[in-house]
Amino acid sequence: MNFRVGLGFDIHELIAGTTIKLAGVSIPSNKMIKAHSDGDIIYHSLADAILGALSKGDIGMHFPDSDLKNKNLDSGKILSHAYSLMTNNKYIINNIDITLILEEPKIKKYKDNM
């Protein structure tokens, strides 16, 4: 059996806003994530881990911020792209652990939808 391990990491500045998107869920907040795409750091980290495990670079290679079509891009599309590369190469995910370091907003009531 062939195992591959990927490690994804994402960090962004928080700025004034109304919503933070995490794992596809929009969470009301007085801040937002400053990013070229929608800034979903959970989807970005997971996509980056998949791409890394496949030795396919990172999300910046696949979705450069210099390309205007990626402006405000739904990060679900980034994750779907990485997942498609994984399944097309006949790999599966065995285990995922995501650590979110964020003081606010509190996400407890949103976790089940994430």
Located regions from the model:
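Active-site microenvironment for binding and transforming phosphate-containing groups
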Residues: V5, A16-G24, S29, T87-N113
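Glycine- and Gly-Pro-enriched alpha-helical subdomains that act as flexible
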Residues: I50-N95, E103-E104
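A short glycine/serine-rich beta->alpha loop
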Residues: I27-S37, D65-N70
